[in-house]
Amino acid sequence: YEKKKNIEKSDEYYIKANTQIKNVLRYQPLSNQKLINNIKKNFSKENLLDYVEHNDENLIFIVGMPRSGTTLVESIVASANNIISGGELRSIYELFKSRYDEDDSDSKDSKDPGSIYLNRINFIRQDHKYFIDKLPGNFHNIGFIKKIFPKSKIIYLKRDPWDNAISLFKQFYVANIPYSASFFNIGVMYANHEEIMRFWKNEMKFDFLTIEYEKLVQNTV
């Protein structure tokens, strides 16, 4: 219906489909706020955990809300010489979760998660100088990334909230991005993501490049 420009009918079916998904998944929007509170607690200036730091200057992490333009930027950056992308890797997320999840009995065992990460990506990176890790949700993990790879590059994609929400709502993500089936849940997640990005920038003073999606797609030269 959308391809036929029957917007009213297409909207009707988008809403019906997402209502069914929402009822099945029963996503709890406050669950991410708990995660953010835990991140802030662990990454306050008074409570930085002591990990081995790696001086690899050639790791590039592309983060942002899903559907914010991360894939577009990944393709642009990866087109340069001597760069390879690993795509949406879950390694940083898994290493972070094992150390900061309050319910994880193995939490904080390793003082060198950076070596674990580098060993995991070596089979993809091989002889390439630069390596891209493009998991949008790593915006949660910027503090963890900058702690173990202080010289890494982080690119943050930011898109208009409403356009971002519509794009998410129209995708069939199901369990991968469970909040995408509800505009309310998307709104809560968007606000959460803005909160943690302000924390990284204003409180922790981490340096990252912010790219606005709208300006990027307008610049076609």
Each language-model region and where it sits:
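Alpha-helical solenoid repeat scaffolds of the TPR/TPR-like class and their adjacent stem/linker regions
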Residues: 1-125
